[in-house]
Amino acid sequence: MKIVSVILAVALGAGNPAWAQDTSELQLVKRVFEQLQPISISKNREYCGYIGRDAAGNVAFTKARRGRKGTCVPRDPDALAVVTASYHTHGAYSPNYVNELPSVEDMEGDEAEGIDGWVATPGGRLWYVDTQEMTIHLICDLGCLPADPAFVEGDTGEILPSYRYKALVQKIEAVGG
């Protein structure tokens, strides 16, 4: 999938990719999460929506919807001509959740909708969920986005830069998720 290659190239410092529309999605995602993360953390709720293209072909996003602890269902993406991905936050840090990784349910939900996903974590990580390959990719690490001051680094153990579906299931089960 082209967007994953572009995003990984940006994340790995490979310079400016040729597809500006894909880097514009990444830039938009970061701006959206920079605004949502502090609210999500302070209210300890997930916030979610969709990203895609409007009728003019511009990268756009739907208004974020407030969810609950551990879940969020976005509004219908009527304003988007094409939906490319979901986005959501994971709320405040909690030792009771494996919230530094996209969940298996996050990945399965995006796959069921036929789209990819973006996930922001309480530690300030940004993840990309590629449902065509059923992998998650760490786009930027701790503190890349606003982080919960109560976040405890390392409570989920070592976080790898990517996971395939089966490895994600195993990781979450191993840490008690």
What do these predicted ranges mean?
Residues 2-15:
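Bacterial N-terminal signal peptides
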Residues 6, 53, 92-94:
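General alpha-helical segment detector with a strong preference for membrane-spanning helices
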Residues 12, 42, 53, 78, ...:
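A generic structural signal for short, solvent-exposed coil/turn residues
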Residues 13-15, 52, 117:
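Small side chains
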Residues 16-20:
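Sec/Tat signal peptide C-region and signal peptidase I cleavage site
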Residues 21-22, 72-85, 89-177:
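Active-site-proximal loop/helix of nucleotide/amide-processing enzymes and allied scaffolds
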Residues 21-68, 73:
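N-terminal secretory signal peptides
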